[in-house]
Design a protein with these regions (language model features):
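C-terminal intramolecular chaperone/autoprocessing and neck/assembly modules of extracellular spikes
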Residues: 162-216
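Periodic small-residue-enriched repeat registers in elongated scaffold domains
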Residues: 1-174
Length: 216
């Protein structure tokens, strides 16, 4: 059975639901709520305005379990999620949140504004499978975007950038400074060391080379 309520909605496939205005739910168990949303594939879900869940380049019923909510969001991969405004999730189990962000690695989380996409491994492969490393790029696990916004349409601008990137191999890149706070409330027996300049002058600095031949 299908349910279509409102105006110019289209519910196609078993147990599909389209409610609102010009929504399209196609594929078993898919739901589209709001205005001009498309849930294309099995068990996909959209809510809001002009969101797309599923890969519309494929046949009805292919892919599934994608979610897009908010405005202008696209979740095109299996079990992906795109939230808020004009975000895109293009790889399996990836999630994009914020404004104009893109999550294009497996299981990746993109937040913030207009991150730089295309880094890591944008294929559907993951570097660690069945307890063994496959040799593929570890890929990006988490990114915070700090790119610009296009004032004419409120979407991502032409200058994407990243404030912080964490890769699956544990490496990370921070674009700015890292400030580590020292909270006095968490400490006891605080004793003043007195003059420490003479002690600092005793520090014997060293340079060395890592085994990977990267000079430090």
């Amino acid at each position: 059975s299908t349910i279509s309520l409102g105006k110019e909605n289209w519910a196609e496939g078993a147990s599909t639901v389209a409610i609102g205005f010009k929504n399209h739910a196609a594929g078993g168990g898919s739901t589209a709520l709001g205005q001009e949303n498309v849930s294309w594939g099995t068990t996909n879900f959209t809510a809001g305005y002009q969101n797309v869940a599923g890969d519309t380049s494929q046949g009805v019923g292919s892919g599934g379990s994608a979610t897009a909510m908010g405005k202008y969001n696209v979740a095109s991969a299996d079990a992906s999620m795109a939230l808020n405004r004009a975000t895109t999730a293009t790889n399996q189990a990836a999630t994009s949140m914020g404004l104009g962000t893109t999550a294009d690695n497996v299981g990746m989380l993109a937040v913030g504004v207009n991150n730089a996409s295309g880094a890591g491994d944008t294929s559907a492969n993951y570097y660690y499978v069945d307890g063994a490393y496959t040799g593929s790029n570890p890929g990006v696990a988490f990114v915070v975007g700090n790119g610009d916004i296009n004032s004419s349409n409120g979407r991502a601008g032409d200058n994407p950038s990243n404030a912080f990137v964490v890769n699956y191999d544990g490496s990370a890149t921070l674009a700015g400074d890292l400030t580590v706070n020292s909270d006095m409330r968490l400490k006891s027996n605080i004793v003043t060391l007195g003059s420490t300049l003479s002690k600092l002058l005793l520090i014997d600095g060293k340079s060395y080379t890592m085994k990977s031949n990267e000079a430090i």
